[in-house]
Amino acid sequence: MLKRSFDKSKLPSRHVTEGPSRAPHRSYYYAMGMTEEEIHQPLVGVATCWNEAAPCNIALSRQAQAVKMGVKQASGTPREFTTITVTDGIAMGHEGMRSSLASREAIADTVELTMRGHCYDAIVGLAGCDKSLPGMMMAMVRLNVPSVFIYGGSILPGRLNGEDVTVQDVFEAVGKHQAGNYTDAELEVLERVACPSAGACGGQFTANTMACVSEAIGLALPNSAGAPAPYESRDQYGEASGRAVMDLIEKGIRARDIVTRKSLENAARIVACTGGSTNAGLHLPAIAHEAGIEFTLQDVCDIFRDTPYFVDLKPGGKYVAKDMYEAGGVPVVMRELRRAGLIHEDCMTVTGYSIGEELDKVTLEADGRVIYPVDTPLSTTGGVVGLEGNLAPEGAIVKIAGMSDDQLVFTGPARVFECEEDAFEAVQNRAYAEGDVFVIRNEGPAGGPGMREMLATTAALSGQGMGKKVALITDGRFSGATRGFCVGHVGPEAAHGGPIAMLKDGDMITIDALKGELSVALSEDELAARKDAWSGPRETIYASGALWKYAQLVGGARLGAVTHPGAKDEKHIYADL
């Protein structure tokens, strides 16, 4: 154990542990078995999103114990607490998905309130699913305390008929089943083997994308994102994270010393080169917002456009997170990006060293199977690109990983649906034609409310063999597991009177991922006339409660669908109170 002393006169916990007036507070600590020494050490929040909703977060409570050991080894006092999470895999395809994106804000808010209320000096945050990762990182940057993020790890792939399978295969099997190409018995076998362990979805879906971001942005220890949830090595990363946060307290390194414009650009690079989730286009601007940095969807997409895609991960490729970890993980990917001059090497990390200094320690080379050399990429542009045009003045985003150049332009008639359920019913009934452009509107952050993911619909289309024969645009979102030509985050959203609200069946829509354009063959005068005749936002059933409140506060997808003014308007920093 490393014995060292800290000056508590400038730490937030002095407000609850120091001086005669805090005797009542210390009584509570003694009631929990804390020693005098532990009371007067720095108090470190160990925050998890543990719950029994799904395998994504089920291992976090155990992993938190390793983090606490690390904090104690470095002369800190860990204080474990949990917050909520909504797991997309369970919320998918029904009204529960409206709670998903709102849960990101709830996670950030509740972590902030817990830290503020109990005057914790630093935080180690553990998260394991799509919204809990960005929510936890947002809280760290908002609080601007010494912070270390650690991912709970990915699930192991299942095996069926000698091949790896994931939950993505199950979603797509539903479409095959509806098309009569998959039996009840086959579906039952697949659903039982696809998810064999604890951990988040194994492909480069949203959770693993944001786990890679946590390393690239500098908030997580190098290579800590890769080990699957069941691996014992996760405990070693947990202990190391606990020790690391104590070093950050000692050195005075805070979250905003790490999260800068340059580190956000590094994070966007890792998303692009791994063919990551389009949801990163929502979460990176939201994390930036907490630091007072304007980093828009278009900024993210500009980086995507000139970043090669060279890591062959599902859903666009062949492999899963475990395979990338065994090939060297994020450090090897970052090393390849550095070879191409695509990394800001001077960015600080939670190790106390810069990204460049950490990459100097990496000796593994790209294996050419999972991680290709950057100079022989799978494609010369990122796996995710941004779009703008008269249908999306505030931008949109599309994932093109695994698509060939001849699939990157699509023109077809609009098939307009007012919600996802209507679109899914049309797919089930095969009430659409090859060449259609599905338009699913009223699914934006405010209009949904909640900006649902459309995986049920896109997976069903893929399962019917139509994933490459139709296209889909929405003011909602897509799961990281989505395949096909699917455009999300169309802004302004329908509820705010965006052009997507003015579309009618048969309008000719063009999606051009090569030029970065999303347009409809209507004149400005016609769009204006339709806007004048527009009856206003569709009424929702959410007239009270958390989703009503969220709809009143949430901003557009372009800036991350955030719900408060952000650091640019703050009048104090929590850690300095």
UniProtKB/Swiss-Prot annotation:
One of its GO terms (molecular function) is dihydroxy-acid dehydratase activity. Keywords: 2Fe-2S, Amino-acid biosynthesis, Branched-chain amino acid biosynthesis, Iron, Iron-sulfur, Lyase, Magnesium, Metal-binding. Residues 1-22 are annotated as: Disordered. The keyword Transferase does not apply. [2Fe-2S] cluster binds at residues 56, 129, 201. Mg(2+) binds at residues 88, 130-131, 453. It comes from Dinoroseobacter shibae (strain DSM 16493 / NCIMB 14021 / DFL 12). Functions in the biosynthesis of branched-chain amino acids. Catalyzes the dehydration of (2R,3R)-2,3-dihydroxy-3-methylpentanoate (2,3-dihydroxy-3-methylvalerate) into 2-oxo-3-methylpentanoate (2-oxo-3-methylvalerate) and of (2R)-2,3-dihydroxy-3-methylbutanoate (2,3-dihydroxyisovalerate) into 2-oxo-3-methylbutanoate (2-oxoisovalerate), the penultimate precursor to L-isoleucine and L-valine, respectively. NCBIfam families: ilvD, PRK00911.1. The lineage of its organism: Bacteria, Pseudomonadati, Pseudomonadota, Alphaproteobacteria, Rhodobacterales. Homodimer. The active site is at 479 (proton acceptor). Binds 1 [2Fe-2S] cluster per subunit. This cluster acts as a Lewis acid cofactor. This is Dihydroxy-acid dehydratase. Residues 1-10 have a biased composition (Basic and acidic residues). Gene3D superfamilies: IlvD/EDD C-terminal domain-like. The keyword Magnesium applies. Its EC number is 4.2.1.9. It catalyses: (2R)-2,3-dihydroxy-3-methylbutanoate = 3-methyl-2-oxobutanoate + H2O; (2R,3R)-2,3-dihydroxy-3-methylpentanoate = (S)-3-methyl-2-oxopentanoate + H2O.
